[in-house]
Amino acid sequence: MLALQEAKDSRSKKVNKIEDVKALKSPMEAFARLEEYSKNGYDSIPAEDKSYFLKCFGIFDRPATPKQFMLRVRVTGGQLSFEQAMMIGELARKFGNDYIDLTTRMQVELRYLRIEDMPTILDELKSVGISTYQTGVDNFRNILIDPLEGKSTDSVIDATPIMRRLQESFLEKPEWISVLPRKFNTSISGSMANRSNIFSQDCAFVLANKNGEWGFNLYLGGKVGKIAKSADVFLRNSDEVELAFKAIITLFRDYGFRDNRNKNRLYFLLESVGIENFAKAIRTSAQKDFLTAGINMVQVEPYENQLGRVSLKDENFAVHMVVPSGIFSGTALMDAARACNVYGNGALSISVEQNIFMLGIKSSIVEPLLKEKIFERYKNINTPYFNNVIACAGTEHCPFGVIPNKPDAIEMADYLSKKVALPNDARVRMYWSACVKGCGINGLGDFGFEGCKTKVDGKSEYGVNISIGGKLLGESEEGHSLLKSVPLIYAKYYIEELMVVYATMRQANESFEKFYERVLQFYSRASLAFFMRINAYLKHNDMKRYVLELNEKPPTLGYEKFEVFEFGRKLYKNIIGTEAYTAYQDFAPLGNQKPANLKSVEKNINENIAQIVYKMIHPDVNQRAVVFSELVEEIPYI
């Protein structure tokens, strides 16, 4: 423990402003006054309760909807019984404008709620076994689990009972409400497929095998932009998982940093002390010498969104329903619950990708179920651009949002569905976050979109930072920056260019994640960005015949200097009709030839484009471009 104490002592003794607020009272004191607030109205609520304490119970004051609240509802394991789904749906209809958001923590959020109705809403939820405790601020957030945990054929261990044990250790326990330095995200899964964004959590228990024994490897320190690292710990059973979890949360409570609010997640404690020292502290605190890590068994790619149904261990089916951007309603939730109750066991499961599974559907009645009215609005199988899309709240509902986000994600998916059709076996994960907080887990998307502001003709406009190459397989991997500050109105045209490549070159049943690994990773990201920008410009200016094409096996192997010359050579030949030089060696010209002026052949070509291409193949090596960054910003948007 010495390393942890030394790390804590090395930090500033001055706590952050939120810690000062937390010292004013206990959260239970604020919650006890909820009935009083409901009688006296919004203006009777103290500022600290609106800004912090009520959030400990999922009650969020939302400036975007003055004097109205968002309620974040904890859906344990993302699982809703028929009675629970009907209750949430009815409450949304009665009190919340019939609006529901499905979230990336497998929960629901109700909006447009008045404080006057809040006690009634909470009582009704409690009557069906639903809590909103600890769904905000410095608390234990909903534990993520596979939405098909224990049911899918790739589920080796049913971790549901373990997840419930972990939740019982803190949920609605005053001694664990608002005592952490920062929020704490947990995930556990006994499945071989990563359906729960398992590696992006503060604490993750991942299916593993050691010497023929099934259990869980422990990963720690995940957050936005960072994948959790292996703690080199193997946990053999539910007792060991619970022991380790209690040790971890106690250590984080006692030694976590409370000075800089931006650097007090578990990740920063681990960075300070080293994960090896933290793992030793876990063993000491738990008084258990846990085994070292086994083999990570998360090796299967999920496929059910593409098939619309998945066969379960009990020979029934889980039927998928696509909810674009997670925008749902109380009426729709009730309709889904009723349909599932008639055709299945009435249970619904919310996925991390903001979609819904109906459980317990017998094979003989899947087709009749799909004829129900709910599937007219929410498709069983949508296009590959919709099946796996994620989008957080955005400017309409979130004070941190920079772009609208949810409608942007839908608009792009709709555009791409029409422009670049993909077969149902394709899989493209487009994850959208409206700001840098990353609630739409954009870093893990095949394409990630992060809202920002940018300039177009000197005017401020909505924009996105675009990343590529996020991975769910193996131990997951954050995507890499591709394009910065792209005007939102043009982003779809750039993505379209890589979708054309994917549609043309992909193999049967090949996801974009696998395609990126097989083809695109051998190009530098700078070259891909240039490819997207230049092709979009050429197509939108009636010069489609000049566009670049990518090779399945690029000869340049990601070496940017070579890529610049090779792309320039191809563009020149496409425009002029002949090679710029008669001979080449190592992606450079031989001889003293001087390429022709592009505008002498194509008078309509933009002067910037002509200069860019010439610079890429310039006969003077000292004037020839060697990196794309000096070229891409000179390309007009379209």
Predicted regions and their residues:
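Intrinsic disorder at enzyme termini
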Residues: 530-559
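Mobile "lid/hinge" segments at catalytic clefts and subdomain interfaces of large enzymes
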Residues: 184-268, 448-504
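Small-residue-enriched alpha-helical segments and adjacent helix-cap loops
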Residues: 42-47, 68-213, 323-459
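Terminal amphipathic helices with adjacent charged low-complexity linkers/tails
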Residues: 257-308, 365-366, 529
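C-terminal lobe helix-coil module of Hanks-type protein kinase domains
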Residues: 564-638
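Intrinsic, low-complexity N-terminal interaction/targeting segments
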Residues: 49-64, 89, 130-133, 307-308
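Long hydrophobic segments that form regular secondary structure
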Residues: 313-317, 325-350, 501-504, 508, ...
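Short glycine-/aliphatic-rich beta-strand segments at the starts of folded cytosolic domains
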Residues: 57-78, 309-326
